[in-house]
Amino acid sequence: FSCGRLPEIWIERLNDMVEIRESVVKKLGSGETCSRAWESGRDLAIEMGHTDHLMGMNPHQAKFLGHSVGLELDESPVLANGFDRAMHEGCIMAIEPKVIYDDGAVGTEDTWVAGKDGLECLTSGKSFPLHAEW
């Protein structure tokens, strides 16, 4: 949500986070490990110019793009370096790429379940407007 009109730079950043999310979803859905999906998303963010802003502002950046959800809110596996296993069928994960700058933050967050044919979005996903102004 945006208070007032979202400046073009922020729309571009939001679209970048959508692209990162889609890349990570594709990797995980094809059986890649959480670690490889993290690397792919991080590398894409670097290419987009968000090196010092992905998941926080340098040096206070979280080193993950999402986490499993279960009995606890944040569970393993995590979309991060060192989680060298794929999501198994039935695994539920929140995928939440975001960038944070001095003048604001923007990102996406949806929850996905791993199935036989890839990941399925459990939250609003593409059926919800990418951003709303008021």
Protein language model features and the residues they cover:
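Active-site neighborhoods and metal-handling regions in enzymes and metal-associated proteins
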Residues: 1-134
